[in-house]
Regions:
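Phosphate/pyrophosphate-binding loops at sites that engage ATP/ADP/AMP, CoA/4′-phosphopantetheine
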Residues: 93-110, 266-283
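Glycine-rich phosphate-binding loops at beta-strand->alpha-helix junctions
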Residues: 113-122, 282-290
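Short, surface-exposed acidic
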Residues: 29-39, 50, 104-108, 138-140, ...
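Condensing-enzyme catalytic core mediating Claisen C-C bond formation in acyl metabolism
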Residues: 1-81, 180, 186-262, 266-270
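A structural motif shared across PLP-dependent enzymes of the aminotransferase-like
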Residues: 56-61, 120-127, 290
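Localized chelating/binding microdomains
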Residues: 2, 12, 45, 92-96, ...
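Acyl-thioester C-C bond-transforming condensing/cleaving domain
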Residues: 30, 80, 84, 93-109, ...
């Protein structure tokens, strides 16, 4: 089996209370009906604070505001802002993952890098920029999982799992970074209101090795047993992520939780059969659409 021996995280510098973000949103929308809907969504979100790569959303932010002009930043400006800030946050998450195992990028010897993002598209991409920032060897093998949205970390971990099973000495670094708040736009549809309520910016990194390598390094962690995924075709229109002239636009239908509830038993039953497990043997399930 493969093993996740460390997980690191990082967030951008601008931290805002949800109440301050709500105030910003209501001013940006400047519409009584939208403000009323936002207040209901914000108060039921369960979120207290969010981080952003831009200072606009909270009272503590200083410097030039990204959304200061009446005209929304176009897609080019949003991509440029991502290119300025995303890699630094990703590198911070990577360094945090190594710090937790009392190691460093330089001494550990990463052989493979897998990057994950859906909030920007450009090439050469963040994979090469991260290699340069970390001074990784030029022959480090690279893979990128792009534009797969909320579930993208799982395909990335699956790739890492296959690598460590095929190459017992492989040391795989997986890093995900998303700057969702760059795509803020005050549109009145429910999908947009909901996405403006819950998403923030940040990065996470995981170091994966084979069990044999982990034992050799005397490191514990989370062992990965198996993977299983299935596509629920009837739900493909409930979530989406589309490139528009102004921003990347989210499709996030309020029916998603009910749709999952209607199909989760069937999914788990198939999972039991495919993986030869019993649902009751799993202490806790984490269910996430994507």
């Amino acid at each position: 089996m493969s093993r996740i021996i460390s997980i690191g995280t990082a967030v951008p510098q601008y931290k805002s209370n949800q109440s301050d973000i709500l105030e910003f949103m209501c001013k940006a929308y400047d519409n009584e009906i939208a403000s009323r809907k936002l207040k209901i969504l914000f108060h039921s979100s369960g979120i207290e604070t969010r981080h952003s790569a831009v200072p606009d959303f909270g009272k503590s932010g200083t410097g030039k505001k990204f959304f200061a002009d009446e005209n929304q930043p176009n897609i080019e400006k949003r991509m440029f802002k991502y290119s300025e800030t995303a890699v630094g946050i990703a590198v911070d998450a990577i360094k945090d993952s190594f710090k937790k195992i009392n190691s460093s990028v330089e001494s550990f010897g990463i052989t493979h890098l897998i990057t994950v993002t859906c909030t920007a598209l450009y090439a050469p991409g963040i994979d090469i920029e991260i290699m340069e920032k970390l001074n990784l060897p030029h022959d480090t093998e690279r893979n990128s999982v792009n534009f797969m949205g909320c579930n993208a970390a799982f395909p990335a971990l699956k790739i890492a799992d296959k690598i460590t099973k095929a190459e017992k000495n492989a040391k795989v670094l997986v890093v995900c970074v998303e700057l969702c708040t760059l795509h803020f736009q005050p549109k009145y549809d429910t999908d947009n209101l909901l996405s403006n309520t819950i998403f923030g910016d940040g990065a996470a990194a995981a170091i994966m090795v084979s069990d044999e390598q982990a034992e050799h390094l005397n490191l514990k962690g989370l062992s990965i047993n198996r993977f299983y995924s299935a596509l629920l075709k009837n739900g493909k229109n409930l979530m989406g992520w589309n490139v528009k002239p102004i921003n990347f636009e989210m499709v996030l239908n309020a029916k998603v939780p009910a749709f999952i509830g209607d199909h989760i038993r069937e999914f788990i039953s198939t999972c039991e059969e495919k993986l030869n497990i019993k649902a009751e043997s799993i202490g806790k399930w984490a269910v996430h659409p994507g």
